[in-house]
Amino acid sequence: MTRQYAFYFDSSACSGCKACQAACKDKHSLPVGLLWRRVYEVAGGAWTRRGAAWVSTVFAYNVSLACNHCERPICVEVCPARAYTKRADGIVALDEEKCIGCRYCSWACPYGAPQYDEQAGHMTKCDLCADNLDAGLPPACVAACPLRALDFGERAELEARYGTVHVVYPLPDAELTQPALVMTPHQDAARAAHEPAWIGNREEVNAE
């Protein structure tokens, strides 16, 4: 592998408009039920009564997530059809013609990135808009974000520019697959580690 492309996401800038999600769906003509990029609406805190007053400790932030093109992609390891490959540029590619639709990759991926297309009978996933990259263009989701909360590039360059945070709630431990994802956390993300927090749109993003 000569490089590792990665996504960058700035949770502190994201408004939750889901333009990235819509742009991805439009570019790849995804059917109903498939979302290669999903925006998780995280909420937490509570209202507590203090005497005659009610005090709010409520917080909320968004996490936009697609395939993280992990450095240790578990989908590549578990696929019995060898339909997945890790390209020299770090992109985890899926050969849909080889895929037998067993869904092992979907069950194994801690991010739920591979998604089953009921009509086609095989798995599908984000390819980092490889055709756009070949044409010198950014991924559709990155180009669509009105607040520039998304970026992409080589992982080392993104880390040098934005820092080395790779996980916030509700994402799993980065050590599992070493995701090629760099993040700027929302100011309230640290609270989700020690206060009650939940995904507010769990059904929409198909979160387990």
At which residue positions do the language-model features occur?
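Non-ligating segments of multi-cofactor redox enzymes
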Residues: 1-208
